Amino acid sequence: MLYNPLEQFTVNKIISLYTVYYSMSLTNSSLYFIIAAIISFFIFKYSANIPYVSLINKNNYSILTESLYKTILKMVKEQIGDKYTIYMPLIFSLFIIILVSNLVGLIPYGFSPTALFALPLGLSVTIIISVTVIGFVKYHLKYFSVLLPSGTPLGLVPLLLVVELLSYIARAFSLGIRLAANITSGHILLNIISGFLFKTSGIALLFVIIPFTLFIALTGLELIVAILQAYVWSILTCIYIKDSLILH
């Protein structure tokens, strides 16, 4: 039992390999991310065949996968427009890998890779750099007009330029911090409640029922948060891509 709520986020080495020139380790965070990647691979593999799945052969898994695929497809179409086919594989991949990474952390003694700020921040910075490159390749220097709204008075140009630049850079951090903070806070709360349940297991039944009910409710809430955060990440990525394709 973990008595320190933050102990669950400790990165521990499972296997270490040392050579003369470098060292390589498999940590618990890496292991669970590999598990999430393997699960995501099978979801991708099945999703690729969705248009060819027979109505007769459908089961609960196929219905769930198809629902996820069509939900993301609809969102990408609405946000990006005519060029949605180019970016649909990227957005769906991000949605699934983040969703599965969030969910594996709900397994008892599991580890959520997205609870570590390094992974979400690395992904978010990569996304912002990529959409900036997309916009720069399409519009060249004109792309930087996104930092200066049209009709801005000349006297406000320096101030607005700094504000818009900071706002643009903040996207790279807010996207990752939002995900990591939500997953981390939920796991900490669940750990505190489960620790309280463990300590009160020998007391009167009334003192166990209330925390246990709260624990079940919070677990359900965490499940919803895991799905919503993956969806929010996907829709924000679509918005950033759209902004790089269409200058306002």
From Swiss-Prot:
Residues 1-3 form a propeptide. Keywords: ATP synthesis, CF(0), Hydrogen ion transport, Ion transport, Membrane, Mitochondrion, Mitochondrion inner membrane, Transmembrane, Transmembrane helix, Transport. It holds the Pfam family ATP-synt_A. The chain crosses the membrane at residues 24-44, 86-106, 117-137, 146-166, 183-203, 205-225, 227-247. F-type ATPases have 2 components, CF(1) - the catalytic core - and CF(0) - the membrane proton channel. CF(1) has five subunits: alpha(3), beta(3), gamma(1), delta(1), epsilon(1). CF(0) has three main subunits: a, b and c. It is a multi-pass membrane protein. Belongs to the ATPase A chain family. Mitochondrial membrane ATP synthase (F(1)F(0) ATP synthase or Complex V) produces ATP from ADP in the presence of a proton gradient across the membrane which is generated by electron transport complexes of the respiratory chain. F-type ATPases consist of two structural domains, F(1) - containing the extramembraneous catalytic core and F(0) - containing the membrane proton channel, linked together by a central stalk and a peripheral stalk. During catalysis, ATP synthesis in the catalytic domain of F(1) is coupled via a rotary mechanism of the central stalk subunits to proton translocation. This is ATP synthase subunit a. The keyword Membrane applies. CDD domains: ATP-synt_Fo_a_6. GO terms for molecular function: proton-transporting ATP synthase activity, rotational mechanism. InterPro entries: ATP_synth_F0_asu, ATP_synth_F0_asu_AS, ATP_synth_F0_asu_bact/mt, F0_ATP_A_sf. PROSITE patterns: ATPASE_A. It is found in: Mitochondrion inner membrane.
